[in-house]
From Swiss-Prot:
Biological function: Together with its co-chaperonin GroES, plays an essential role in assisting protein folding. The GroEL-GroES system forms a nano-cage that allows encapsulation of the non-native substrate proteins and provides a physical environment optimized to promote and accelerate protein folding.
Name this protein carries in UniProt: Chaperonin GroEL
Molecular function per GO: ATP binding; ATP-dependent protein folding chaperone; isomerase activity; unfolded protein binding
InterPro entries, A to Z: Chaperonin_Cpn60_CS, Cpn60/GroEL, Cpn60/GroEL/TCP-1, GroEL-like_apical_dom_sf, GROEL-like_equatorial_sf, TCP-1-like_intermed_sf
Binding-site residues for ATP, renumbered to this chain: T30, L31, G32, P33, K51, D87, G88, T89, T90, T91, G415, D496
The keyword Chaperone appears for this protein: yes
Any coiled-coil regions, as ranges: none
Length: 547
């Protein structure tokens, strides 16, 4: 076992802080409309230029092990916020740094870390409640475009495209982002369906860069039971292999010998195949398999209906124009089902929605309806160079996530102002002792930090002056860093999804609290390599092998 180095107390916290600051300082320069770009070196190809906080955070690895632990903890804040809300990664990083910095001062002055944590937790709870109170729902195309524009670093073209896509396929419809062949960015709507099941083995991947299995003009086998025996699957596999078309297998599960055989044949190139689990559970799974079968013109091979897998022929298989499978989702585009059958199925689901008495059932039926009728909107992103293409595509993906978050939980005023307005929620936070009260005050101070940083990135205005003026204002009044004017930010289109702001604060407080209550850091001791090369065996030349 490798020997360990252990550092305690203030030494550990100070080193962790160095790591936190290194990562946060690199990330926070990207915040706001006046945020700068960060250039990231790549081992192969051109460097990447980005203004996306989580992309910067993911690239940072520090030489010192303890400092690196601090950096990785804050990286987790950015990563988790991106996963949950799709945006707000830089805000989350700025908040985490501020909470840890303020907390550390108080721990050094003798405050109990665990009480500080309790105070921080209570404060965050009240601020989140206040954010929900000041949140407003969005529905119109214009409001959706505003959110998309802000999240795409003030690119109105992207905001308009996302609003248009949501208008075409509905708020629950599927929107994917792809690289265009030319320089123009455009929206294309393709009929299709997506369900939340990914490939059963990464060996099915055909595009290693995106870790996706892409099947062009595939056949689709739909089975409602587990497949573990290769014998029952073999006849239909041989028939599909003879057709020369790729095959997607959707079943309850594929395991053991059957999965191993599929993987081996896929790697040898004898079969173009991918396997996924069936979506849903119980009766809902049966209904969703039937939806897929109707959309693709196939048949669910089910023993309940008298169909056996070993007797299946090509007529049982569904067909589609293209299928994309990643680790989490399967998207079926251009299903070859009969339009009249698809329409009848849609009407059947609409009838079930009207009769449903359960909110949960209604929600799930509406999801199925969206998958069958909404189709897939494809945003084809064009750019002059590959570097610009990657940067723009990342911004579009962020903006899309943020816009969905806005539709789910509503919007609040942007530009760091919502957190300033939510400070009044701290009046309701109850502290049992002085240290908990200090924890609440730490959050009060940290909530100002995103606005300070947005102003600092403009490079022309004094943050303290702006902060005071915004605090004295009310409602949507704030500082527009793009125009450097004080105005009604919502009317100016400066808004943030409530979910993004909430997730940023919750994740930042969670990680900063863990760092504050850390008393020891354990790392591997690096073995120092000797500069002297080992002496070759066999003695010295010309000495007859003698030493």
């Amino acid at each position: 076992m490798t020997a360990k180095d252990i550092i305690f107390d203030s030494d550990a916290r100070a080193k962790l802080k160095v790591g936190v600051d290194k990562l946060a300082n690199a990330v926070k320069v990207t915040l706001g409309p006046a945020g700068r770009n960060v250039l990231i070196d790549k081992k192969f190809g051109a460097p990447t230029s980005t203004k996306d906080g989580v992309t910067v955070a993911k690239e940072i690895e520090l030489a010192d092990a303890v400092e690196n632990m601090g950096a990785q903890m804050v990286r987790e804040v950015a990563s988790k916020t991106s996963d949950v809300a799709g945006d707000g990664t830089t805000t989350a990083t700025v908040l985490a740094q501020a909470i840890y910095r303020e907390g550390l001062k108080n721990v050094a002055a003798g405050a109990r870390p665990i009480d500080l944590k309790r105070g921080i937790d209570r404060a965050v709870k009240e601020v989140v409640l206040e954010l929900r109170n000041i949140s407003r729902s969005i529905s119109g195309k214009k409001e959706i475009a505003q959110v998309g524009t802000i999240s795409a670093n003030n690119d109105p073209e992207i905001g308009e495209l996302i609003a248009e896509a949501m208008d075409k396929v509905g708020k629950d419809g599927v929107i994917t982002v792809e690289e265009a062949k030319g320089m123009d960015t455009e929206l294309k709507v393709v009929e299709g369906m997506q369900f939340d099941r990914g490939y059963l083995s990464p060996y099915f991947v055909t595009n290693p860069e995106n870790m996706e299995a892409e099947l062009e003009d595939p056949l689709i086998l739909i089975h409602d039971k587990k497949i573990s025996n290769m014998k029952e699957l073999l006849p239909i596999l041989e028939k599909s292999a003879q057709s020369g078309r790729p095959l997607l297998i959707i079943s309850e599960d594929i395991e053991g010998e059957a999965l191993a055989t599929l993987v081996v044949n896929r790697l040898r190139g004898t079969l173009k195949v991918c396997a996924v689990k069936a979506p849903g559970f119980g009766d809902r799974r049966k209904a969703m398999l039937e939806d897929i079968a109707i959309l693709t013109g196939g048949t669910v091979i089910s023993e309940e209906k008298g169909y056996k897998l070993e007797n299946a022929t090509l007529t049982y298989l569904g067909q589609a124009g293209r299928i994309t499978v990643d680790k989490d989702n399967t998207t079926v585009v251009e299903g070859k089902g009969k339009p009249e059958e698809i329409k009848a199925r849609i009407n059947e689901i609409k009838g079930q929605i009207e009769k449903s008495t359960s909110d949960y059932d209604t929600e799930k039926l509406q999801e199925r309806l969206a998958k069958l009728s909404g189709g897939v909107a494809v945003l084809n992103i064009g750019a002059s160079t590959e570097v610009e293409m990657k940067e723009k595509k990342a911004r579009v993906e962020d903006a899309l996530h943020a816009t969905r978050a806005a539709v789910q939980e509503g919007i609040v005023v942007g530009g760091g102002v919502a957190l300033i307005r939510a400070i009044k929620g701290l009046d309701n936070a109850v502290a049992d002792n002085e240290d908990q009260k200090t924890g609440i005050e730490i959050i009060r101070r940290a909530l100002e930090e995103p606005l300070r940083q947005i102003v600092a990135n403009t490079g022309t205005t004094d943050g303290a002056v702006v902060l005071e003026k915004v605090k004295n204002g009310e409602g949507d009044f704030g500082f527009n860093a793009r125009t450097e004017q004080y105005e009604n930010l919502v009317e100016a289109g400066v808004v943030d999804p409530t979910k993004v702001t909430r997730s940023a604060l919750e994740n930042a407080a969670s990680v900063a609290s863990i760092l504050l209550t850390t008393e020891a850091a354990i790392t591997d001791i690096k073995e120092e390599k000797s500069d002297m090369p080992a002496m070759p065996p066999g003695g010295m030349g010309g000495m007859g092998g003698m030493y």
